[in-house]
């Protein structure tokens, strides 16, 4: 279960800006057609994936758009009819989301603060599942492209990747 209702009341809801999404395009494996965006939020990532020609399965525990299906990634059964997962998880639950993404057995990409590399638990997940890191060149302001004074959340961020052709690597966007 997600901790409290922080995401529901927007305390842990930070959309990814376009410039931070664009570098992942070349890391989507060939043959992928249907991508599950398990934390769809307002659709920042999903809109880009749709623009690139992918079918997006939009789910979120707290839907914010009409096209989003209510689904708790950590508690509900997995969406089976997808080729890959791409998402921006609640940062307070990055370890749980990493573990669950690894359990799916599917390729995935998810963006989070570089602190994902810390702790023995996450270290073991990286090693066991041969995960790679796509390092972004600048800190990310998670405002979804909507610059506001209210929400300026800057992190040095990375994309965590499970990919059949990229294993145990640090890549640079």
Question: What is each PLM-predicted segment?
Answer:
Residues 1-173:
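Class I S-adenosyl-L-methionine-dependent methyltransferase catalytic core
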């Amino acid at each position: 279960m997600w901790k409290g209702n922080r995401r529901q009341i927007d305390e842990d809801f930070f959309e990814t800006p376009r410039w931070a999404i664009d570098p992942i395009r070349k890391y989507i494996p060939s043959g992928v057609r249907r991508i599950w965006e398990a934390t769809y939020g307002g659709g920042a990532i999903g809109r880009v994936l749709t623009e690139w020609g992918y079918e997006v399965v939009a789910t979120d525990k707290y839907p914010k758009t009409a096209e989003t299906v209510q689904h708790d990634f950590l508690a509900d059964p997995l969406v089976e009819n997808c080729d890959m997962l791409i998402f921006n998880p609640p940062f307070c639950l990055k370890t749980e989301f990493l573990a669950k993404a690894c359990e799916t057995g599917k390729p995935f990409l998810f963006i989070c603060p570089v602190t994902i590399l810390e702790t023995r638990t996450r270290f073991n997940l990286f090693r066991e599942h041969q995960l790679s890191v796509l390092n972004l060149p600048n800190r990310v302001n998670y405002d979804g492209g909507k610059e506001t004074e209210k929400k300026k959340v800057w992190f040095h961020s990375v994309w965590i990747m499970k990919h059949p052709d990229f294993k145990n690597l640090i890549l640079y966007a």
